[in-house]
Amino acid sequence: MLKSLEFEVPMISAIFMLILLIAYFSKKRVKIPENSLFNVIILSSFIMAVLDTIVHIICATNEFSVIMDSYYEFINISNRIFSLLFFIIFSSFTTYLIIISIKKSYDGFNKNKYILGIVWVLYFISTFFFNIDLIEVGNIVNVSGNMMILSYSAITINLVVSIIVSLANIKKKDKRYLPAFLMLLLMVITR
């Protein structure tokens, strides 16, 4: 029995990301740092959407006590993966904005991509020091706890840096900054 239809949005997101993946990877691309970062962003988003759909289906088809007894460990590990993927997506986006802002960063990107990878691994390792708390709000199962605080903090830092870099380069009138401005607008609207 379905408690709620909360899995529909993640499922549609997964389908949309699959279509985007097929369209993006079916075309030939120029090998530049921006495209490498976009590859990471789009693949991470797809993996996250599929895993999110699975977690939401589990939560929508089971009672809270069953989720806590049978699926807690899977959901806990899934949330570590979500946290890492969100961090990868937002740090890749921040790196993308820095690269398009500083011409010299093209050369430095190949050297610094290893540093970015090390930061991702260190962040992922740090997630093992925290667990999640599952809470039931009506028919919906939500996640809270120190793991989420770590995730929100890391993502907020990346968003702030992205917005600062974009605002510092607003005079360039480069359409590549549009995603950062759209994120800022969405954050203002949703508050």
Name each model feature, range by range.
Residues 105-115, 142-150, 164-186:
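Membrane-helix boundary/juxtamembrane motif in polytopic membrane proteins
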Residues 29, 57-64, 99-105, 131-139, ...:
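Transmembrane helix-loop junctions in multipass membrane proteins, especially transporters and channels
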Residues 1-6, 96-123, 168-173:
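Charged/polar interaction segments and conserved charged motifs
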Residues 20-24, 92-100, 152-175:
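Alpha-helical transmembrane segments in multipass membrane proteins, preferentially the mid-helix core
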